[in-house]
Structure formats: C-alpha cells, structure tokens
Regions:
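A short N-terminal beta->alpha junction/helix N-cap motif
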Residues: 15-27, 52-56
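Acyl-thioester C-C bond-transforming condensing/cleaving domain
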Residues: 41-43, 59-64, 74-234
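N-terminal alpha-helical transmembrane segments of multi-pass membrane transport
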Residues: 9, 42-46
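Short glycine-rich or small-residue beta-strand-to-loop segments that form or flank ligand, phosphate
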Residues: 48-55, 83
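Active-site phosphate/pyrophosphate- and oxyanion-stabilizing loops and adjacent acidic/basic residues
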Residues: 66, 70
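Loop/turn elements at helix/coil->beta-strand transitions in domains of secreted/extracellular proteins
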Residues: 3-6, 47, 104-107
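Short catalytic helix/loop segments, enriched in acidic residues and glycine
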Residues: 21-39, 72
Length: 234
C-alpha cells in the first residue's frame, strides 16, 4: 500500500465560537460522535489517533493525545500529536497516511479541539518569551510575520492593498460558512483593511486571527475501508 491508497472518508466540525459553552472534552466527543454517525464505522474499529496543534486548555499536557484517547474511550495502537503551527491539520493527514502505510494502524481519527477562550490558563510569567522574545516586540505570531513581511517589502516591494485583498477574500469565505464565528461574519472592504490599526508593521489588525473555541476532525483510512466512506458534504 502507498500513501495515495489512503483517503479522508469523513469530516466533522463544530461552529467556531468566540467563547464556547462546552469544555474541550465535550467538543472532542461531539466530533467523534458525528464522524461515527457519518461513516458508519464502529468506535472499536478506530485504532489510530492523531491530534493537531497545541491547546491552552485543560487538555494541555505532554500526553494530550493519550489523555484524549482515554477520555473518548478509544483503544488505539498508534497515538500522537502534531505540532506544526497553522499547518498541523495537514501534518496530521500526512502522519496518519504514513502510519497506515507502515501498518501501525488501519483506521485513524484525526482531531483538534480547543476551548482556549473558555478556559484561559495561559501563564507566560515563567517562560522564555519574557526574556528572549517579548523585549524585541515578538509578542505572538503578528510580530514574527511583521518582520518577515518587512524583509519581503525591502527585497521585492509590497503592495499593501494586495495584502488587503487576502483579508477581504478570506472574510468573504467566512460569510459563506455557517460554522464561521458569528462575530466575524461581517463583510469588509479594502478601505476597511487599509484603515485598520497597525499591529506589527506592516501587519494590520485585519491581517490577524483572534483566539476562538471549536473542534474539527477527520476519519482517515485505507482503500480497504472505503465501503464505509461517508459524504464529506453531509
């Protein structure tokens, strides 16, 4: 079997919420239940779990993936978490495909769930950031992307309205997504973008994402399980 013999056979997501009314474990359970319902697979058939990204909630511990498997009642032979920032979801797919290809599991559950806003337990008072990054203004991703964008501007030139087009297009997509955060389902224009507050020059407020709560997941498997393929658009 090769990597191309694997497929996403089911997808589920909660609504993105400014602040959730359920904790991270409840959201994770909702995703699992929806995927089982969509794909018709029995929970006992899931033998792989791959968690995406980092969480700042009660699920935040070095054994997040193992803890989640225990809470959800999953008995898996392959269990890990992928920390690659904003591309963690894609990393999960690659990791699950490789695990199935090498015979480490047959049916994988890919999951991210977070209630960072509901259960904000962030404490940076004793981290490296206070000494090594915050004095230079790198207080989160916007600062780092500001430096990268400035370097690009110096070397190649940068049309700020081009960046605005990205923000406007993404917002327009959110307007079409029923699961998008309601607070952000409001159209914006290029002028709105250009007039938004500068955060880390040239990164503006409307370039940034805000913290939000929610969960999403995939059921991933090889061709031998395609008899239980669910409709992704359900």
């Amino acid at each position: 079997m090769g990597l191309r013999d694997n497929a996403i056979v089911g997808y589920a997501e909660t609504k993105v919420m400014e602040k959730s009314d359920r904790n991270v474990w409840v959201l994770a359970g909702e995703i699992l239940e929806e995927l089982l319902d969509k794909t018709g697979v029995d929970k006992n058939e899931i033998d792989g779990l791959v968690m995406a990204g980092l969480t700042g909630t009660g699920a935040a511990n070095p054994f997040w993936a193992q803890t989640t498997a225990d809470v959800l009642g999953l008995e898996v032979g392959f269990c890990e978490q992928v920390h690659t920032g904003g591309c963690s979801a894609a990393g999960c797919v690659a990791r699950a495909a490789a695990a199935i290809d090498y015979g480490m599991c047959e049916v994988a559950f890919l999951l991210f769930a977070d209630t960072h806003v509901l259960e904000d337990r962030t404490d940076h008072s004793h981290t490296y950031r206070r000494e090594w990054t915050e004095p230079y203004g790198l207080m989160g991703p916007p600062g780092a992307f500001g430096l990268l964008s400035r370097r690009y501007e110096v070397q190649y030139g940068l049309d700020y309205r081009m960046l605005g087009k990205l923000a406007v297009t993404q917002r327009n997509h959110a307007l079409l997504n029923d699961n998008a955060c309601e607070k952000l389902r409001v159209p914006i224009t290029i002028d709105d973008y250009m007039n938004s507050r500068m955060i880390a020059d040239p990164i503006r407020l409307l370039d940034c994402v805000m913290r939000a709560d929610g969960a999403a997941g995939d059921r991933f498997g090889g061709t031998c399980h395609r008899s239980t393929v669910g409709r992704i658009d359900e």
